[in-house]
Amino acid sequence: MFRRVAIIGLGLIGGSFAAALRRQGLAGTVVAGARSARTLEQGLALGLIDEGSQDLALAVRGADLVFVSTPVSAMETVLTKLAPGLSDRALVTDGGSVKTAVIDQARRALGAHFARFVPGHPIAGKEKSGGEAADAELYRRHRVILTPTADTDPEAARRGRALWTAIGAEVLSMAPEHHDQVLAETSHLPHLLAFSLVDTLARQGDSTEIFRYAAGGFRDFTRIAGSDPVMWHDIFRENRGAVLDALGLFRDGIDRFQRAIED
């Protein structure tokens, strides 16, 4: 489907994307762009990529597909660096968990090429991070939400949908603002609560004793607190409005339960 694919960011999401493309025979040459030479060396050793470059414009040169998988807060800087190397017909998409902020950043960074940008969010992941955790089956039977705008080229949107379908994902379309609201309530808020509970208990003087006797329910609820804190810091910050709204609704619910218990 794609002669040359450039993947910017080779962590779990980017690495799994590379592995899935290879598994399905959807890419001729896979190139990675990353800040760290060690990350690129690891990608080569794992067989995820064929080439790597720390120069992002060079990494995307000649690519007909570019997948950006970096922290949301770094997206504009990354897109600005790679933009000079984009070919006119290159399809650009991303794996960011927040869409409104990413779209605003892409509009500023990509200029005329913004029409070829198809914003996406694969609803898949693990507690483990890094390219060594890459899984070719990560996206199979999982939802991928695409949030094209009125400025998105229809042919680019069609190719983006076909790409994720070929990988094995269930593809949905949604308005960016609605995506951010829904994900704040179903994903961002649960992570925030898990982080908060673990942090609250860890600050107690007898925290070792508390965690020693934590049963299965506690482990199930707090499992996601082991997720990458840097990534989640970015998500909370970039989707702060929707997250704060969701947190307010949850606080109202907690207040109702507190009053019911007191009564």
For each feature predicted by the language model, list its residue ranges.
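Glycine-rich, N-terminal phosphate-binding loop of Rossmann-like dinucleotide-binding domains
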Residues: S69-P71, G96, P148
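NAD(P)+-binding Rossmann beta1-loop-alpha1 motif at the extreme N-terminus of oxidoreductases
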Residues: M1-A63
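Internal alpha-helical scaffold of NAD(P)-dependent oxidoreductase catalytic cores
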Residues: A136-R223
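Interdomain hinge/lid region at the active-site interface
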Residues: S207-D263
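Rossmann-like NAD(P)-binding element
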Residues: L56-L91
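Residues at the starts of beta-strands that form the adenosine-phosphate
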Residues: R4, T29, R116, R143, ...
